[in-house]
Amino acid sequence: MIQTFSSTIRRKEMDAVLTCMVDEKTGPGELNTRFIQALKEFTGCDGAVAFRSPSIALSYALKAIDLPAGTAVMLSALAPFWQYDAVEKLGYKPLVLDVEEQTGLVNAQTVQQGISEGGRLLILHESMGILPEIEEIVALGIPVIEDISHSIGAVLPEKSDEAFDGTEKKQGKKQNRRAGSFGIFSILGLEEFDTITGGGGAVLLAPQRRDWIVLKKYTDAASRTDILPDINSVLALVQLKEFNRNEQARKNLFAVFQRALMSGKNRTFVRQPDEGSTIWSFPVVLNGSVKDVKQYASRKEIEIQPAYSDSVISRLQDEQSKDLKISKALFLRTVLFPLYPRLGSETAAKIAKVLGTLP
């Protein structure tokens, strides 16, 4: 059976973790520091801290923002449930937003609606590696915390502007901005099936110096039990170094699978090409019976899984989700097919054939 997920742990990752164990330096230390430095260079952020869980990372972000208790925090209905759970436990009120059908993401219109209902901060989950209308959302003027667990490495071209130097007009250069650089803070999950895994944990990043200065006051006083151990950090470090190689492999597979899917009646989400998005699994929005598709794939020895089985909407009562019609439909109809760098060409061809002949 071809499994839906693989963490793509190769010999390099195994050797790095084994060396960490042999050196008996498994707690937070030098390797955590090296991982953070590499991540800062990769993302261009001003500062970052690696924690033992995404929930802990979020708690420090909200401390730094100084969000009053009871404030409504906006979340996507298709975001991972840990966000909803953490927001409640930290003393805030989750305000769940619907998504747009083509991308599975919240857009500026739904966020504006959330603001009108009292939302004062947005946790923006960039699901499936797709970037939303992020500039339009940030322009609404509320604090945004990006979740780049799927979208790390995605790049949004920035419009070039004309600039003045005091005497003459100059044409500004077009610059690209990476996922994670738009919000006040961003969270990079390192959980088992995140794009970069450390076997658990998360990194809280501050893109701008002014925000890092504030955040650092809190993280400098963090308990050692909040900080990511070296044994996790070294795994994440090697994964980060291998990111470009792995991402190119994922993109090549995605292109093959997407072409195959186009011959049938089902679809995947709309995304920007090339660096405008990154690849996390292969989501398929089914036009027919999920049960029939699952049985068909299983007969071909391919495991598929519901895309949003651990999402916010998966835990809400019917009364709570009655206005989340698009999210509900995508929750029920979207499945994930295997897509990861270790798939061989023969296996990839087998998956592509199934995608092109789905019921």
Pin down the residues of each PLM region:
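Conserved PLP-binding active-site segment in aminotransferase class I/II-type PLP enzymes
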Residues: 1-64, 68, 344-359
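PLP-dependent aminotransferase class I/II
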Residues: 33-37, 42-49, 121-125, 210-359
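Conserved SAM-binding loop
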Residues: 50, 75, 204
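Conserved PLP-anchoring active-site segment centered on the Schiff-base-forming lysine
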Residues: 61-114, 296-297
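Structural detector of well-ordered beta-strand residues that form the stable sheet scaffold
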Residues: 74, 95, 144-147, 187, ...
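A short acidic, amphipathic alpha-helical/loop segment
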Residues: 86, 133-137, 350
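Active-site phosphate-binding strand-loop segment of PLP-dependent enzymes
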Residues: 102-198, 203-205, 210, 336
